[in-house]
Regions:
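Extracytoplasmic small-molecule ligand-binding "clamshell" domains
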Residues: 23-123, 127, 194-199, 219, ...
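Extended ligand-binding regions for polar small-molecule ligands
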Residues: 23-42, 68-80, 146-172, 220-222, ...
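Substrate-binding/active-site groove segments that recognize
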Residues: 335-359, 366-377, 423-424, 448
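Bilobed "Venus flytrap"/periplasmic-binding protein-like clamshell domains
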Residues: 49-58, 63-84, 120, 139-199, ...
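Export/targeting segments at the very N-terminus of extracytoplasmic proteins
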Residues: 284-331, 365-368, 382-386
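Hydrophobic residues within well-ordered alpha-helices
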Residues: 77, 107-108, 158, 204-209, ...
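Acidic, polar ligand-binding/catalytic clefts
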Residues: 57, 75, 86-157, 223-225, ...
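Catalytic and substrate-binding regions of cell-wall glycan-acting enzymes that process beta-1,4-linked
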Residues: 250-251, 392-458
Length: 473
């Protein structure tokens, strides 16, 4: 919503795809591998480079409040190291967020000193990486669905069904093995939808609750944590997915002193009893997505499709981006009104509409026209750089639509200063937004993105083929 103050599905049998921490965020990409550093070199540099899983569940911080499960443990380790410093020089943590499946490779290349994934993560022998003592032992995987739908008691019952998984999911090997067994019995495999890289495990769980995805698999601690936020989720605990695993931190094999220090720290560390207080308080207030393709909403979208396609085409946009924004703003209600001034399907303000030459936003056509034109204006004026891919470009446009383009540009500047990727909103610039303005804008962009992905999965059925023109003879 513009405020007055600021105007794949991939179904296949499983084939594996190849102080405050957030203020210390580091680079997304490192072009030259750094040398291996053990504890002496780390103390000399006064910086411990920590590669973290970029998901908000693992490493998020909101306006100085920890929501990531690794935050407290890493801060305690920082204090432990400084408490044992002989020269009195303090070590600072430099947080480097990466996708889960990139963490160990980055460590092996010397881009960080320590990996703290916050989830189960398998180490490959080729990486030459050592594990710490277990942070958590015997961690099972749970099958997650939504209450009211069919329960499962064994993995083979998933034959022919689809699981939504993030790349790097700990369930990958287990599904591969069960598919081999199903093939021997000539049964359909369990299909895997590798979700879009803009989604983290917490996003997938929210979309399962909404009914956009039907099933996923996550570690027990993640399931238990998010069950307090997403109460409609159902956990089929009796399904034996794989042998329980252990959670670790990871270091290079030749960083033996660092590993020894980590193990000594872990022997005495206890998770704070209030670790999730801020997490629950923040997330319980946030908007949660629902299925935008439920029967009634799908019927509304079908009626709105011509006008959305018309104005998206005029502005060179994907009409499903307009549809996703319209659903988030007004739930496809052209008569929606807001006391602050936003009006209609796109919830655009009169002042924003006037900036793009639309003086009356009461009709459906003019309302969508104003919204599409305003999005195009933001895109053209602030986010036209060829360095942005189209998904990230749209995310920046949405963030600017919500809180103003100048503010978003300022966040990109701050991200660049801290070594984050200023051309990536998801998991990079959004970290600056979380710190500066809280979760509101991040939740807004993520929600519209989820609706877009939900529509995009059904694009073929939402876009009837053009009528054939009879040839003249």
């Amino acid at each position: 919503m513009i405020r007055p103050s600021a105007l794949l599905m991939l179904c296949l049998t499983l084939l594996l795809p190849a102080a405050a921490l957030a203020r210390l965020d580091g680079p997304l990409e490192v072009t030259r591998p750094g040398k291996v550093r053990d504890l002496a070199e780390i103390r000399s540099s006064r910086t411990l480079r920590v590669l973290v899983n970029q998901s908000r569940n693992s490493s998020g911080e909101v306006q100085g409040q920890a929501i990531g499960v690794e935050y407290h443990r890493l801060r305690a380790f920082e204090q432990y190291l400084n408490g044992h410093a002989r020269d009195g020089q303090e070590i600072n943590l430099k947080i480097i967020p990466k996708a889960k499946d990139q963490l160990l490779g980055a460590l092996a290349r010397g881009e960080g000193d320590l990996v703290a994934p916050g989830e189960l993560l398998d180490v490959k022998a080729a990486h030459k990486i050592s594990t710490s003592d277990p942070i958590a032992s015997g961690v099972p995987l749970w099958l997650v669905g939504v209450k009211g739908e069919r329960r499962f008691t064994k993995l083979e019952q998933l034959s022919g069904r689809t699981l939504a998984l993030t790349t790097g999911s700990a369930a990958a090997d287990a599904i591969s093995q069960v598919n081999q067994k199903l093939a021997l019995h000539k049964q359909p495999p369990v299909k895997v939808e590798w979700v879009d890289p803009t989604l983290a495990v917490e996003d997938v769980l929210e979309m399962v609750q909404a009914g956009i995805f039907h099933l996923t698999i996550v570690e027990k601690p993640i399931a238990e944590r998010w069950s307090k936020i997403l109460p409609k989720l159902r956990f089929d605990k009796q399904v034996a997915i794989s042998e329980p695993g252990d959670e670790y931190w990871f270091v290079r094999q030749d960083a033996s002193m660092l590993r020894a220090s980590i193990d000594r720290f872990l022997k005495t560390y206890r998770t704070p009893s209030d670790q999730d207080v801020a997490f629950q308080r923040i997330y319980r207030r946030l908007y949660q997505v629902r299925n935008p393709l439920a029967r009634v909403d799908r019927q509304r979208l079908e009626k709105l499709r011509p006008v959305l396609q018309k104005h998206a085409r005029e502005q060179g946009m994907d009409w499903l981006n307009l549809a996703a924004l319209a659903f988030k703003e007004s739930a496809f209600d052209p008569g929606a009104r807001n006391s602050g001034g936003p009006t209609g399907l796109m919830q655009i303000t009169p002042s924003a509409a006037q900036r793009v030459g639309v003086n009356n936003i009461e009709s459906l056509d003019s309302n969508v026209q104003a919204g599409a034109r305003y999005l195009a204006l933001i895109r053209r004026k602030f986010f036209a750089s060829p360095k942005l891919n189209e998904r990230e470009r749209m995310a920046f446009v949405l963030a600017a639509y919500n809180m103003g383009p100048e503010r978003v540009q300022g966040m990109r500047t701050e991200a660049r200063r801290r070594g984050l990727n200023p051309n990536q909103w998801f998991f990079q610039v959004e970290r600056i937004a979380m710190e500066q303005v809280g979760m509101g804008a991040v939740s807004y962009v993520n929600s519209v993105n989820k609706y877009y992905l939900a529509f995009d999965r059904e694009r073929e059925s939402l876009e009837p083929p053009a009528p054939k023109i009879a040839s003249r003879k």
